[in-house]
């Protein structure tokens, strides 16, 4: 691979750290804002160079950046995430935690100091977040959430659902679908348990 300039290395490092933290790639505007570029064109130019030099691959979709292995390197550093059943992207369904398989995930993107599991999505309530029925979502285990996170939420200890999280006040939480045809779910905070945050998506084509 061709050597990178200092700025190109900084952009690449930002993309890596952003993906590790959020589970998806930054947008051009995220890059522009972080580096105080005057226009999206400057950020786009850096992505073109990184792709030409073989460090990333881009798809013609929003946030469509994929990290490429360095020359001579393969993704040998992997960890296994158990497939722990299914999750509702629709009405909440009874939580199922039987491990049926394991999915390898590269530690290049997902730090080893966390635990992960995956769930098969059922339903279309998150379709506008590009999460389709049949997809597998990769979940980082944690018992807390920030506004805007997509989480696995357990309601009343039995029913699990995949929704976007929003804290209304000390007593109530809103679970928001990414589908305009579906209703939000308002839940008492003490009736809700966060099981993890979505950090990745796996789709079998």
Swiss-Prot record:
Belongs to the peptidase S24 family. InterPro entries: LexA, LexA-like, LexA/Signal_pep-like_sf, LexA_DNA-bd_dom, LexA_repressor, Peptidase_S24_LexA, Peptidase_S24_S26A/B/C, WH-like_DNA-bd_sf. One of its GO terms (molecular function) is sequence-specific DNA binding. The keyword DNA repair applies. This is LexA repressor. Homodimer. Pfam families: LexA_DNA_bind, Peptidase_S24. Represses a number of genes involved in the response to DNA damage (SOS response), including recA and lexA. In the presence of single-stranded DNA, RecA interacts with LexA causing an autocatalytic cleavage which disrupts the DNA-binding part of LexA, leading to derepression of the SOS regulon and eventually DNA repair. It is an enzyme of class 3 (hydrolase). Its EC number is 3.4.21.88. The keyword Disulfide bond does not apply. HAMAP family: LexA. Keywords: Autocatalytic cleavage, DNA damage, DNA repair, DNA replication, DNA-binding, Hydrolase, Repressor, SOS response, Transcription, Transcription regulation. The gene is lexA.
């Amino acid at each position: 691979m061709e050597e990178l300039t200092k700025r190109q290395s900084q952009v690449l490092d930002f993309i890596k750290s952003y993906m590790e933290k959020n589970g998806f790639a930054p947008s051009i505007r995220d890059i522009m804002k972080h580096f105080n570029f005057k226009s999206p064109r400057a950020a786009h130019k850096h992505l073109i160079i990184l792709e030409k030099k073989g460090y990333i691959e881009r798809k013609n979709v929003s946030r469509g950046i994929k990290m490429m292995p360095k020359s001579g390197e393969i993704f040998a550093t992997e960890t296994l995430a158990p497939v722990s059943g299914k999750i509702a992207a629709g009405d909440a369904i009874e939580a199922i935690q039987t491990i049926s398989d394991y999915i390898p995930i590269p530690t290049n993107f997902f730090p080893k100091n966390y635990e992960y599991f995956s769930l098969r999505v059922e339903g279309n309530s998150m379709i506008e977040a590009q999460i389709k029925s049949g997809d597998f979502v990769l979940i980082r285990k944690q018992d807390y959430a920030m506004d805007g996170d997509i989480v696995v939420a357990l309601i009343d200890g039995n029913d699990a659902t995949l929704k976007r999280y929003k804290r209304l006040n000390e007593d109530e939480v809103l679970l928001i679908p990414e589908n305009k045809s579906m209703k939000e779910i308002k839940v008492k905070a003490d009736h809700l348990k966060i099981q993890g945050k979505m950090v990745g998506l796996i789709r079998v084509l």
